[in-house]
């Protein structure tokens, strides 16, 4: 079973990594192509393209300018440990054992507007480039056109490497939109996490994002390879709802946040 999650806007390059091990991203030539294009943008143009404040636009212009190969631990950090956001709060990889990192490396992928697909231990230099960015490029009008079917092909390679055909989608619609469902040699399992609010179960963004990370953590910690085991997920009060679920669309409900 292969999991995919979204990246995060917030990054942490200050905290020492929880493991000294690292790997190199497999698709840096494509990332470098985007970096070369983005370096031609002024901070004002970046602000307009990405809908950022002047301060954030300046920061990311500087990031694009300082991006360089080769990646090493002095200028980059493992992707799973560099991203900081609601998903990664739930995942909490800071306390992973080396065996946990091994399992994650085989079974978890992060989708990225700049890097395409990242493995957990892949070194990553800081960036901000959301998948939905309308960056006109040599392959089309946006990043979906830039990546085309390549992300799906790389996920197929990862599935084949583990001899499996199940993909657990824990990514947002924005990022999973870069995956061509029909091109995947996989059974795709989608998930929804709903919390009780005003008498109804609803998707609450903050909690749903964190729950995706919790589910990824659950799979890693339990070494799950059979999707049937997903139904036993019970972290922080969530429970599987057979009534609300379908075969490949699993719904988890929670009556009261425990965080």
Swiss-Prot record:
Task: Give the source's domain of life in one word.
Answer: Bacteria
Biological process terms from the Gene Ontology for this record are: response to hydroperoxide
**Listed GO CC annotations:** cytosol
Q: Which family does it belong to?
A: Belongs to the UPF0246 family.
PANTHER family for the chain: PEROXIDE STRESS RESISTANCE PROTEIN YAAA (PTHR30283:SF4), PEROXIDE STRESS RESPONSE PROTEIN YAAA (PTHR30283)
Q: What is this protein called?
A: UPF0246 protein Pmen_1032
What organism does the record attribute this protein to? Ectopseudomonas mendocina (strain ymp) (Pseudomonas mendocina)
Its organism's taxonomic lineage begins at:
Bacteria, Pseudomonadati, Pseudomonadota, Gammaproteobacteria, Pseudomonadales
């Amino acid at each position: 079973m292969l999991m995919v999650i979204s990246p995060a806007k917030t990054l942490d390059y200050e905290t020492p990594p929880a493991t000294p091990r690292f790997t190199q991203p497999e698709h840096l030539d494509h990332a470098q192509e985007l970096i070369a294009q983005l370096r031609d943008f002024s901070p004002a143009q970046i602000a307009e393209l990405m809908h950022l404040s002047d301060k954030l636009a300046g920061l990311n212009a500087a990031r694009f300018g300082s991006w360089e190969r080769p990646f090493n631990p002095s200028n980059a950090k493992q992707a799973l440990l560099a991203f900081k956001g609601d998903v990664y709060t739930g995942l909490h990889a800071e306390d992973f054992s080396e065996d946990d990192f091994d399992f994650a490396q085989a079974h978890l992928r992060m989708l990225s507007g700049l890097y395409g697909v990242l493995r957990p231990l892949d070194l990553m230099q800081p960036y901000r480039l959301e998948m939905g960015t309308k960056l006109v490029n040599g392959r089309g009008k946006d990043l979906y056109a830039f990546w085309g079917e390549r992300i799906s092909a790389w996920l197929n390679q990862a599935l084949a490497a583990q001899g499996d055909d199940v993909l657990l989608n824990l990514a947002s619609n924005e990022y999973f939109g870069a995956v061509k469902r029909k091109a995947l040699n996989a059974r795709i399992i989608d998930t929804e996490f709903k919390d009780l609010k005003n008498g109804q179960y609803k998707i609450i963004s903050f909690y749903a994002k964190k729950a995706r990370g919790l589910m990824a953590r659950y799979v890693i910690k339990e070494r799950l390879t059979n999707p049937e085991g997903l139904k036993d997920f019970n972290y922080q009060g969530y429970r599987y709802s057979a009534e609300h679920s379908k075969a490949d669309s699993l719904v988890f409900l929670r009556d009261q946040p425990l965080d």
